[in-house]
Amino acid sequence: LEWRDGGSGDHDSIEFSREMVEKVKTKGSVARERGDFYKQIKRSTRSVEAVYTVPYQPHQPMEPPAATAWFHDGIMEVWACVQNPQSARDEVASLLGLAKRKVVVHVTLLGGAFGRKSKADFVCEAAYLAHRSRRPVKVFWSREDDIKHDYYHAISAQYYQAGLDADGSVNAWLQRTSFPTIASTFTRMIWWPSAGELSQGFVDAPIDTQHQRFESHSADAHVRIGWMRSVANIHHGFGLGSFVDEVAVAKAIRVTDMWRELLGNRSTVTPEEDGADYKNYGESLDRYPIEVKRFKNLIDVVEASTDMHANLPKGQGWGFSMHRSFASYVAVATRVEIADGVVKVLDMHAAIDCGLAVNPDRVKSQIEGAMVFGLTIALMGGISVKQG
């Protein structure tokens, strides 16, 4: 076999990230707007700016993809760790030219997935081999296969700018985002993020300023992009939380007080009133509004359960952020120590408001897992690509 490099054969993720950074420093397509940010920022006494990047992220499930397939009596029978057995059945049927009723998928324990096993490529591989060989076939990927042939979480770049009055109050707010869309995995020639992706922690940012603007940029998809846990909330939550802290530092106030100021005094966040095509995770805003009081309650809970405002030894500090994802509200405070350039996490506290917790232990374990997953991304995550 002689393989061709394809259109992304020279893709370099580090260089691509630099290009995205330069792009988000320019005006993009407006996704939400109130007032006139560009006019107001010129009137501001001072401004704070920041750019944040997130590299491609692999899923790295504890158990790599695996599937067993057996074609017998005109039936393709599959045993696989899949998150979407209906989709796996449909893809296998399409690949082999079989009726859907001729494909049976037995769902095994996932062994971790985080979105990776919603894609059935490894199932199709086993089914194809079993169909051609007419014997049972078991396929299991090595960790190297898993990392190299993942559907990665999107690489991204974000730009933020805030304008401050003479008294230090924030009067103007700008956010820009750029990342390859998941839709590019299914349809060619799509470069812009969907409204659903922009609804994940971007156009629904709970920022209440008189002048604000949210813009998106296009981005090429050079590798396969897929779902990973909270999807676009991963990079949007990181960018927003980091910048709120930057503004707090510029104002010399506590980050929790900075959040309170930016949340304002309204009862709900209404992105659709500012022109956003907001999807709210497919839920009704009447039933699941974005409630400001729930954000503020989380701040109070985390402050009360930690000593985050106490004096700390040299080299230690507390970080705080919060986010709404899939209609649940989460706040986290983290105490870290930096020694010789190495970040050591000493303590983490999380509060969640997910409404009625039918199984509190399950909610607790979910948040514990999210903490570990988030720390992995922040401290050790990331995939680089060179020569495609």
Please annotate each region the language model reported.
Residues 1-358, 362, 379-387:
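Structural alpha/beta core scaffold segments of enzyme domains
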